[in-house]
């Protein structure tokens, strides 16, 4: 949301053949830009109104933008929005073709006599590239997950110049791409990743990463590392009502807020967020691996957004056990030993320390971490965006 009027310095659409352009900066009714830590790419939405005779078509006749370019999806969009206050830096997606937006779809098209209105749904280039490539490479068991993520971004998404912060992972992991899409593989690897800041083989409580894109590029971040960052130096204050455009502190005032979700006990029990029992069979030695995951063993090790320690309720008044003591979900699976290793030896087959991303530990911890991240969902409206 913006209090001051946005300043559109550039808002240009290129035709699919890049032979014609249309400047729509004067016809933008609304522009919404999204960075989402749960989305692997940027998205944006722009509502445009336009009068006829804006673009010269292929036949040389002046036409509307929708039919003159024409708009059919895949066109590039250059956007530059100046900062509308002393603290806002604005948005610039016009300096490098690698940062241009692409039209994913055109919706809400209304054509009247002499005018037209439509909505452009935009994505970053990698969202389209992701649909056209597949990863078939075999990644060795000696390579860290963070290095595999960098390889996929560079070789398959061709985004070597858009790599942001890639947190180093502690654990290596060998796998085969199986012709899956790059974004699918990276988000899958995120759930198997352990922060490199954890003590090797002793403290894996920080399992769980996030993969997302910002203006600075693609980021592969540990949830623990994100939570351990220093708080923002300014405090945001709930101030309902009108906000003055001349108020220097308007960027740090919350106009309205709503709590979309605050705990979902049954959902967490169904997912085994507190405690789960796991049965894994080694297909090489046929030795079963049976373990119980108990979140109480990790509560003190976790980084949280608040100061209070997570406390789970008791099951009933006659028992001292909490919801973190008894498994609420059972997992059954096969260990992927004997498929990726270069040497046909039994090393690591029954050694959980050398096992390829031991799911009995990492899967349980990452599931607990993701569920804790969604304990509360709050929707805030802050008048700080350009």
Segments and roles (model prediction):
Residues 1-132:
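Assembly/oligomerization scaffold segments
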Residues 34, 38-69, 243-386:
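An acidic/polar, Gly/Ser/Thr-rich interaction patch typically located in mid-to-C-terminal regions
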Residues 72-78, 142, 235, 241:
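Glycine-centered loop/turn motifs
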Residues 88-91, 100, 159-164, 197-201, ...:
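Short secondary-structure capping/junction motifs at helix and strand boundaries
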Residues 117, 124-126, 165-277, 281, ...:
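Short beta-strand-centered interaction patches in the first periplasmic/extracellular domains
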Residues 130-133, 149-177:
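N-terminal export/assembly leaders
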Residues 137-144:
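Alpha-helical support elements that line or immediately flank enzyme active sites
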Residues 146-150, 186:
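Extracytoplasmic/secreted envelope proteins and their assembly/folding machinery
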